[in-house]
Amino acid sequence: MNIQTLLNKANKILGSSSSKSPKLDSEILLSEAINKNRQYLILNSNEELIKENIKSFDHLLKRRKRGEPIAYLVKKKEFWKQNFYINKNVLIPRPDTELLVEETLKLFNVNSKLNILDIGTGSGCILLSILKERRNFFGTGIDISKKAINVARFNAKIHQLSNRVKFYNSDVDNFLIGKYDLVISNPPYIKQKDLKCLELDVRNFEPKLALDGGRDGFSKITKVISKTSMLLKKNGRFILEMGFDQKSKILNILKKNNFFINKVLKDYGKNDRCIISTKI
C-alpha cells in the first residue's frame, strides 16, 4: 500500500473519531511511523511502504481513534521555539502558557543575572525555554510527581541545560531551598466538578494530578502563592497562570500575601490568563 492510499484511509477513520484535524493527525502519525517529515509524504505519495511501517502506523492510528493525544503518540510537543519530550506523566504544553516565557523575557534583559523557581514544572518546558533564551539565568524546578521530574531532567539534557538547572521531586509545602528573583507557576486550577467537562483527550489521558485544583480550584494556587511569598526576594517578580474566571479571588490572595499587582495578561482567546506581581 502506498503513502497516499494509507493517508486517505486514515483520514476517513479519524474523521469519525473525536479528532478535530483528521488529515493533519494522519500525516503526523504516518511521518512518525516511517521516520520522515510531512514534506516527504507529499513528495513521495506513490511510494509503497513495507509491512512493518504499515503495522506501526495502524497501531498509532488505533490509539488516536480512542482519543489519545498526538503529543503522547509521537512523544514530543513544540513549545516556544523548541520540541520537548512528552509522555503521559506530564501535561501537554499549551500555546497560552507561552505567555509566561514571553513576559519573563520582556521583564528581564539579556544581561540580567537571574535565579528562577518554577513551581509545578511538569515537562520543564517553561523554565527550559526561558533558560534557552538567557545564558545568565539559572533555574530550579519542583514537581510533586517523580515521573514528571524525570521528564524535565531528560528535557534539560536534550537541550544541553543540565548545568544551569536543578529539578526536585517535592510538594510545594515541603520545599525550602533557596531565594529567588523570579517565581513562575502554572499550577492545577480546574475545579474537581469541572474535570468531567474537559475534552475527551484531556479527561481520559492527561494526568489528573496536573489538572485538579481541588474542590474550588484554588487549593493548589493558594499554596503556591503562600510559598512564593516566602521564597521570593524583596522586589522579586511572580508570574502565575490561572483559570479564566479566577482573577478577582487570586488578586485578593496575592495582596494578602504582600504582593503588588503589576498587570493581568489575557491569552490568545482574550481570557484573563496570567498575573504578574511583585513581592513588597
Regions inferred by a protein language model and the residue ranges of each:
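Conserved SAM/SAH cofactor-binding pocket of Class I
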Residues: E98-C197, K223
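Mobile active-site "lid"/loop adjacent to the S-adenosyl-L-methionine
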Residues: Y189-K220
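Helix-to-beta-strand junctions that scaffold the AdoMet/dcAdoMet cofactor pocket
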Residues: L161, E206, L231-K234
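Non-catalytic accessory regions of SAM-dependent methyltransferases
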Residues: M1-I34, L41-I42, N46
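Conserved Class I SAM-dependent methyltransferase catalytic core
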Residues: R215-T278
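Conserved AdoMet
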Residues: E32-L107
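Conserved hydrophobic residues forming the short capping helix/wall of the S-adenosyl-L-methionine
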Residues: L14, F108, A156, T228, ...
